[in-house]
Amino acid sequence: MLEGKVKWFNSEKGFGFIEVEGQDDVFVHFSAIQGEGFKTLEEGQAVSFEIVEGNRGPQAANVTKEA
């Protein structure tokens, strides 16, 4: 699992990017966010995740919000 911070997330469109120190930003789709209820992320929020190869390159999977 990697750790990063949410760079930005558009809850209307359901996607955004996660910043990872020393690496390129990683695309995140709302469907990759773990948990119940409305799936969104806040700018600057700490998250842990895995990287998988998507249709358009690397993207986040199994995203969990850090306490």
UniProtKB/Swiss-Prot annotation:
Q: What is its main location?
A: cytoplasm
Q: Name one GO cellular component term.
A: nucleoid
In which compartments does the protein localize? Answer: Cytoplasm, Nucleoid
- Give the disruption phenotype, in one or two sentences: A double cshB-cspB disruption mutant cannot be made.
Which SMART domains did the record assign?
A: CSP
Molecular functions (GO terms): DNA binding; nucleic acid binding
Q: Which Pfam families match?
A: CSD
Where does the CSD domain lie?
A: 4-63
What's the effect of swapping F17L? In strain: Globigii
Gene3D superfamilies reported for this sequence? 6.20.370.130, Nucleic acid-binding proteins
Tell me the protein's name. Cold shock protein CspB
| The organism of origin for this protein | Bacillus subtilis (strain 168)
